[in-house]
Amino acid sequence: MVQVDLITGFLGAGKTTFLRRYAAWWAGQGVKVCVLENDFGAVNVDAMLLQDLEARGVELETISGGCDCDTHQRRMRTKLISMAMRGFERVIVEPSGIFDVDEFFDVLRDEPLDRWYQLGNVIAIVDALLPEELSPQAEYILASESAWAGSVLLSRCQLASDAQKQGAEVHLARALEACKCSRKFGPEEIIAKDWADLTTDDMARIAKCGYRQASCEKLHFDAHDAFTSAYFLELGLPRAQLEKNIPSLFTDPACGNVLRVKGFVEDDGRWYELNAAAAGLTAAPIPQGQQVLIVIGEGLDKARLEENLRR
């Protein structure tokens, strides 16, 4: 049976960054790997960040998250059927940061997928700089996306103090308890180190972490109502201006509760990936991009967002 791994994590936690490393590790073991990338919204920005994996023999499939639940499940099921017929040994699924993991497990239980796929690992990415307070919907997603994880990886550990890393672990435990989930993570199940320092032994440990069956008390809400996205195409703003102004989106209450900003900008003939959360912004070179910036959050005011970007 094809092993299928799920990499979860709230918006901006660093799923795509880890996925690149994880998929490359499996490919390096001689395993035929395909990544199924599922982004929130109609434009799949994260898929462009994985272009370099193709050079390592990793194939990439995408699903747009900008649709209703039934349509999304149907698209995912169709993709998984197609991939099962192409001889992959391992499929790695990266859902959006507001994904309902129950939806994924429901799809895997459907025929004929239940005869072709076997759940391998569930890996949860949690930001070491996780804010102290989140909305009830965000707290639920944090808990539900982590409940089945065999391993939790803290991201941005190089930027966090020991107290902040411990605070993120406590926050996760609190979110799980609030959802009446019995899942508790022991020290051996949490990896809290700079990802640049992950060793071959660390990756091998993660690659066999498995999963734990758990359940959370369901919080019923429409993710597309609770979380919205604002798209900015062909803004025409220079990289320096965007890097200067994007942080203000997280601190200006009139913009709404901004959770994540991602996109691309061209600077002197080179493309850069912009990736920002409340904890900070990064700009990294990328082979190809497109003039798009996406803001994801709660109660967004697009006009105010653009006003801040153009200052």
Q: What residues fall within each predicted segment?
A:
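Short secondary-structure boundary/capping segments
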Residues: Q51-D52, D114-R115, A143-S144, F221, ...
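C-terminal accessory "lid"/substrate-recognition subdomains
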Residues: W148-L154, Q158-G289, L300-A303, E307-R311
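Nucleotide-state-sensitive switch-loop elements of NTP-binding domains
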Residues: V2-A13, T17-S135
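Small/polar loops that bind or transfer phosphate-bearing groups
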Residues: E37, V93-P95, R156, E234, ...
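Conserved C-terminal guanine-recognition region of P-loop GTPase G domains, centered on the G4
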Residues: M83, I98-K184
